[in-house]
């Protein structure tokens, strides 16, 4: 018997504001593809501006998945994301189309592509409650520091504001004596798909300028009104509100900072996130990097994917 044919998947990664959205749509048109969002925050309805969600006009008729599937009050674990995206890949492939994942969130994308197993076996409800209480009494940074002490790799990857995941990593260490990062490292070697990974990068100063401009544009487009709607609706302490662009504006609405300080912090956090995204992808995955400082590289990237996945684009006919 021959080897089972693995499903082909193209993945576009890179820091926020680097130009992934336009490239993904150009590639989808050329490669008969459909797009799956690999951004863990674009799943939330009504959170459009702050997540830089693709608009209907930008989609230009290309089907998009994993967008607007949950309410902001809902949680959505990496395991649920993994299951949902794999289902999208299966269905898109069955239609004779190429799945194109656009990200996004490093761990989430990695969990889809590699043979990650998520288990709830390691659990200690009493310990979890203790950590939740400590987070309430002493703040999220306190429990994040505890994680830094026992599992610095996970602490680097998990933002302090993502309390649920911080406590989960602590709980795994407490229960098994093993770092969560070690458990994941053991599992991530085998790719489940025939993958072409495309990474976009650009000159850091130019990228940071683009991020600052994007934040200014978000404010002009109505980010304050979008966040105010969530705030007035009573959305609090949810996974969704930990997203960059929301937690900073929440601080403004709750009179902890001025609007100027909130916007400045949003820009700073966005730049830091972009740096973390690049570090993650460079350390974890075999990526074909394309520097788009001097402009788009769509034709070059198209040829790269065609070669990697042994495909013919509409442009090649």
UniProtKB/Swiss-Prot annotation:
Residues 39-42 are annotated as: Interaction with substrate tRNA. Keywords: ATP-binding, Magnesium, Nucleotide-binding, Transferase, tRNA processing. InterPro entries: Dimethylallyltransferase, IPT, P-loop_NTPase. It comes from the Bacteria. The keyword Transmembrane helix does not apply. GO terms for molecular function: ATP binding; tRNA dimethylallyltransferase activity. Substrate binds at residues 16-21. Disulfide bonds: none annotated. Its cofactor is Mg(2+). The record marks 105, 128 as: Interaction with substrate tRNA. GO terms for biological process: tRNA modification. It catalyses: adenosine(37) in tRNA + dimethylallyl diphosphate = N(6)-dimethylallyladenosine(37) in tRNA + diphosphate. Pfam families: IPPT (PF01715). Its EC number is 2.5.1.75. Belongs to the IPP transferase family. HAMAP family: IPP_trans. NCBIfam families: miaA. This is tRNA dimethylallyltransferase.
């Amino acid at each position: 018997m021959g080897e089972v044919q693995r499903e082909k998947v193209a993945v576009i990664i890179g820091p926020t504001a680097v130009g992934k959205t336009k490239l993904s749509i150009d590639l989808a048109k050329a490669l008969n593809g459909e797009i799956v969002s690999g951004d863990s925050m674009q799943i939330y309805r009504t959170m459009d501006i702050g997540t830089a969600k693709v608009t209907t006009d930008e989609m230009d008729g290309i089907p998009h998945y994993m967008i607007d599937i949950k309410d902001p009050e809902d949680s959505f674990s990496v395991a649920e994301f993994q299951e949902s995206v794999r289902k999208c890949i299966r269905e898109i492939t069955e239609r004779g189309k190429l799945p194109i994942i656009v990200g996004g969130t490093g761990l989430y994308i990695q969990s889809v592509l590699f043979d990650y197993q998520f288990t709830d076996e390691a659990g200690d409800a009493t310990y979890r409650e203790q950590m939740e209480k400590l987070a309430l009494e002493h703040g999220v940074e306190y429990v994040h520091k505890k994680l830094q002490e026992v599992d610095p790799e996970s602490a680097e990857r998990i933002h302090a504001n993502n309390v649920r995941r911080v406590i989960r990593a602590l709980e795994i260490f407490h229960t098994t004596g093993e770092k969560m990062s070690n458990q994941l490292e053991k599992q991530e070697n085998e790719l489940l798909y025939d993958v072409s990974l495309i990474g976009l990068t650009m000159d850091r100063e130019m990228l940071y300028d683009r991020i600052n401009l994007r934040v200014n544009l978000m404010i002009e487009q109505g980010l304050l009104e979008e966040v105010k709607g969530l705030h007035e609706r009573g959305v609090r302490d949810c996974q969704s509100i930990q997203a960059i662009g929301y937690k900073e504006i929440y601080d403004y609405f709750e009179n902890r900072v001025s609007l100027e300080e909130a916007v400045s912090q949003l820009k700073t956090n966005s730049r830091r996130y972009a740096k973390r995204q690049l570090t993650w992808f460079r350390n974890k995955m075999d990526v074909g990097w394309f520097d788009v400082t001097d402009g788009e590289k769509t034709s070059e990237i198209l040829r790269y994917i065609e070669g990697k996945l042994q495909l013919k684009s509409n442009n090649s006919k």
